[in-house]
Curated annotation (Swiss-Prot):
Stretches for region Catalytic region: 422-944
InterPro entries xref list: Glycosyltr_41/O-GlcNAc_trsf, OGT/SEC/SPY_C, Sel1-like, TPR-like_helical_dom_sf, TPR_rpt
Protein name: Probable UDP-N-acetylglucosamine--peptide N-acetylglucosaminyltransferase SPINDLY
Annotated gene: SPY
Keywords assigned: Gibberellin signaling pathway, Glycosyltransferase, Nucleus, Repeat, TPR repeat, Transferase
Annotated region described as Disordered, given as residue ranges: 873-944
């Protein structure tokens, strides 16, 4: 690095008089005299024999004290022996004798400069130049000292004066590279980067091996986002100076940024390569390790992600983002205790880290710790009032606690902040089902508007290569994240098992986050029958659409609707000529790209007033076919026989138990002396939720001592055996149970339900009627109460029904997988025939929509804003219409790493994805000759 002193003289300045000829020294050992003595002294000095030369100069001066050449020579020798004051006396005396002696004046300037007297040094050099304009040494040293003066003034805060001195230096010596360099430093600090870059380029032009200039040029290019140019500059710098630590660190930063850039552009493998190359230049660079963790998380290589997050923490123990993202991984692995530990560690580093506050709240929500969850999410909002996903998760919390109105309000607040929030948009639609009685079209309109907005984010296919042969074997695709022990799995098992694989090639697109034994059983079954199983978890929805087209799927059936981890983005692309929605959601998806919605004539009567974007296709029997769990265990006797009292119960989630439902239940319990109520759902592990529920029933006249509240039971066998606690199951409304109703009936417990005007209200109607218990379907609240009281009045009849109910159910259409699948295949074939005849409901719908909006949806650019790597809260609840819960995982790369909350990393679940956090970003410092700065820390950036 260039020093302020510039070049050292060390006798290099030529002597003015006489000279240093090349004559050999006298043969005799006696000291020469006169002119010979002076010539010999100059020779000795040129050979760095300063002591011997000094003796001769002194001899000469003893005889001729005004000999300027001897005075200068003696001064140089004294200067070389670190005797600057004595040397200055010699040079000063020489100037007295010869005021125009440029050499003596220059040496005076050198001593003044060495002593820090820059002004005096400059004056001496200027006098030397005036005395002899051709004397190059004076100009060179004047340029150096003017540059040093400029730096001193700049450091003292006098920037303009400093610039003036640098410019004066260049007027003196237009080739003096450090002056250009220091001007570059000043203009960089003044944010005038174009001027600074020009100065650095001139410095490098004058001095091609000027490593610092290339380093700082790299800083400017990097800060402009011109990473390739920055890396080229750092590479040139390190070629010149391989051990230049600042440049090596800056190279690591630029490579990390480049890795993040190419990763975001879709080349994650190249991104990983750049991150690893960054570690070659700085093996302890925590940001590169952190971003490797994010990348491996996005590649679903969570073991490697954990390794690099741990390494990032080792080299930067203050990296709260690494702690946060580790928490996301552990949460997704169901290691909730470890996840909580990681989030708490992140918060110990950054107490107001909104992503970790949010994520901790989400875990507490999953655990049913509603009070703790609310506290964390509210703190996240307090830390960042515009943190949209925190409001989304607050909505999930309210939903789980049964406060649907507050839930919808929270989702709408999220959408006010971020109108493109997919999670909040879909969660809002789901929540509205819990309180919709079908009295108006508000919910339909909400779905339709969401669908129109969502479709604009995707380009739609409008032609397919699938041969239009009416009766050829069909390729049926099923797409869902719920091919594990989840409510949907009990209803999709029948077609996976009973499809005629010679007539229907089945392709399963499994988005399961964490596979279990049921997942493996399904996969084995499909593959053995000749089907195809594709694991699509973590794959972009547009890429999934490409897979569907490559598989030439004729009919694509989505099983999720607006619940967690759905692939409606794939459906919006319309990769299959026929698209269907079934079983995962109790309402229209709102997507114009979906042709049909499968139902039956009881869940959606032919004269229904409920509107759907899709065309309804009614199966001949029930639209549901239940495959019981082999872990269910035997039916237990009616508990009233041994208890001496009737126990009513419900295992539906709390969101379905509306105030009106509680009023009706209280009427029933109050009318049956000594009867009890047992309710099981996740939030009841929270004391405040329990107390609120009991207090509401108390206000309705039901003593809390008659109510048993159970939290979520995780083991399926234990959950099913819990039905042995109840004699009669009470369904919810207007959102009826589905899986809970089937479980209740299978365990011998009759269920009372109520018909309504919307699909969600009538699922129980369909199930009970097809099982042969249509008599337990009420049309009004009074009839609902009456039916429950009638059942409770005859314990013997209850016992008889309990003994026969499982067999009755197994023999009914609700459990007849073979017949159900034949009916489903017939419906698929009818859809296909219509398509072959040119009838496509979705295409007609899209044409109308395009005409209405004046847009060509088929040419819409596919870009979903902030769709970061999502990790959503898909919990296996009883009926498990899971809302989308977003975790924030953070991702950073160089200047503005965008995690993925999740969507893109882990930051979010948006696991990596995402909302993404504010990690520490290493910012390039500017190295100057005075005080080269390495790296400094500043807040960067959204993951994911």
């Amino acid at each position: 690095m260039e020093s302020l002193q510039g070049k050292e003289s060390n006798g290099a300045v030529p002597v003015c008089n006489g000279g240093g000829g090349a004559a050999a020294p006298p043969a005799k050992q006696q000291l020469p005299e006169g002119t010979d003595a002076l010539r010999y002294a100059n020779i000795l000095r040129s050979r760095n024999k300063f002591a011997d030369a000094l003796q001769l100069y002194t001899t000469v001066l003893d005889k001729d004290g005004a000999n300027v050449e001897a005075l200068i020579g003696k001064g140089i020798c004294l200067q070389a022996q670190s005797l600057p004051r004595q040397a200055l006396d010699c040079f000063t005396e020489a100037v007295k004798v010869d005021p125009k002696n440029a050499c003596a004046l220059t040496h005076c300037g050198m001593i003044y400069k060495d002593e820090g007297h820059l002004v005096e040094a400059a004056e001496a050099y200027q006098k030397a130049r005036s005395a002899d304009p051709s004397y190059k040494a004076a100009s060179e040293f004047l340029a150096i000292v003017l540059t040093d003066l400029g730096t001193s003034l700049k450091l003292a805060g006098n920037t303009e004066d400093g610039i003036q001195k640098y410019c004066e230096a260049l007027e003196v010596d237009s080739h003096y590279a450090p002056a250009y360099y220091n001007l570059g430093v000043v203009y960089s600090e003044m944010m005038q980067f174009d001027v600074a870059l020009t100065c650095y380029e001139k410095a490098a032009l004058e001095r091609p091996l000027y490593a610092e200039a290339y380093c700082n040029m790299g800083v400017i290019y990097k800060n402009r986002g011109e990473l390739d140019a920055a890396i080229a500059c750092y590479d040139r710098c390190l070629t010149i100076s391989p051990n230049f630590e600042i440049a090596k660190n800056n190279m690591a930063i630029a490579l990390t940024d480049l890795g993040t850039k190419v990763k975001i552009e879709g080349d994650i493998n190249q991104g990983v390569a750049y991150y690893k190359k960054a570690l070659f230049y700085n093996w302890h660079y925590a940001d590169a390790m952190y971003n490797l963790g994010v990348a491996y998380g996005e590649m679903l290589n969570f073991e490697m992600a954990i390794v690099f997050y741990e390494l990032a923490l080792h080299f930067n123990p203050r990296c709260a983002e690494a702690c946060n993202n580790l928490g996301v991984i552990y949460k997704d692995r169901d290691n909730l205790d470890k996840a909580v530990e990681c989030y708490q560690m992140a918060l110990s580093i950054k107490p107001n880290f909104s992503q970790s506050l949010n994520n901790l709240g989400v875990v507490y929500t999953v655990q049913g710790k509603m009070d703790a969850a609310a506290s964390m999410i509210e703190k996240a909002i307090l830390a960042n009032p515009t943190y949209a996903e925190a409001y989304n998760n607050l909505g999930v919390l309210y939903r789980d606690a049964g406060s649907i109105t507050l839930s919808v309000q929270a989702y709408e607040r999220c959408l006010q902040i971020d109108p493109d929030s997919r999670n909040a948009g879909q969660n809002r639609l789901l929540a509205m089902n819990y309180i919709d009685e079908g009295s108006d079209d508000k919910l339909y309109d909400a779905h339709r508007e969401w669908g129109k907005r969502f479709m604009k984010l995707y380009a739609q296919y409008t032609s397919w290569d699938n041969p239009k042969v009416a009766d050829r074997p069909l390729v049926i695709g099923y797409v869902s994240p719920d091919f594990f022990t989840h409510s949907v799995s009990y209803f999709v098992e029948a077609p996976l098992t009973h499809h005629d694989y010679t007539k229907c090639k089945v392709v399963v697109y499994s988005g399961v986050v964490k596979a279990d034994a049921k997942t493996l059983r399904f996969k084995d079954k499909v593959l053995k029958k000749g089907g195809v199983w594709r694991d699509i978890y973590g794959i972009d929805e547009k890429k999934v659409a490409t897979l569907v087209r490559e598989d030439k799927v004729d009919i694509l059936v989505e099983l999720t609707g607006h619940t967690a981890n759905n692939k409606l983005g794939t459906m919006a692309c319309r990769p299959a000529p026929i698209q269907v929605t079934w079983i995962g959601y109790p309402n229209t998806t709102g997507l114009p790209a979906i042709d049909y919605r499968i139902t039956d004539s009881l869940a959606d009567s032919p004269n229904t007033n409920q509107k759907h974007v899709e065309e309804l296709v009614r199966l001949p029997e029930s639209f549901l076919c239940y495959t019981p769990s082999p872990e269910a265990g035997p039916v237990c006797p009616t508990p009233a026989i041994s208890n001496g009292f009737i126990t009513f119960g419900s295992f539906n989630n709390l969101a379905k138990i509306t105030p009106k439902v509680m009023q009706v239940w209280a009427r029933i319990l109050c009318a049956v002396p000594n009867s009890r109520l047992v309710v099981k759902c996740k939030p009841f592990c929270c004391d405040s939720i329990r107390q609120k529920f009991l207090s509401t029933l108390e206000e309705l006249g039901l003593e809390s001592l008659r109510v048993d509240l159970l939290p979520l039971i995780h083991l399926n066998h234990d959950h099913m055996q819990a039905y042995s606690l109840m004699d009669i199951s009470l369904d919810t409304f207007p959102y009826a149970g589905t899986t809970t109703t089937c479980e209740s009936l299978y365990m011998g417990v009759p269920c009372v339900t109520m018909a309504g005007s919307v699909h969600a209200h009538n699922v129980g109607v369909s199930l009970l009627t097809k099982v042969g218990l249509g008599r337990l379907v009420a049309k009004t609240e009074d009839e609902y109460v009456s039916l429950a009281l009638d059942l409770a009045s005859d314990v013997s009849a209850l016992e008889e029904l309990r003994k026969s109910l499982r067999e009755l159910m197994i023999k009914s259409p609700v459990c007849d997988g073979e017949s159900f699948t034949r009916g489903l295949e017939s419906a698929y074939r009818s859809m296909w025939h219509r398509y072959c005849d040119g009838d496509s409901p979705a295409l007609r719908r899209l044409e109308v929509l395009a005409d209405q909006t004046g847009e060509d949806l088929n040419k819409t650019a596919v870009k979903l804003a902030d769709l970061k790597a999502q990790r959503v809260n898909a919990t296996a609840e009883e009926d498990n219409q899971s809302p989308v819960t977003k975790f924030d995982a953070t991702s950073k790369g160089g200047e503005q790493p965008q995690p993925q909350i999740m969507v893109n990393g882990v930051t979010s679940p948006e696991g990596n994805q995402a909302v993404k956090a504010q990690p520490q970003i290493m910012v390039n410092g500017v190295s100057s000759p005075h005080s080269p700065s390495g790296r400094c820390e500043a807040n960067g950036h959204s993951s994911r």
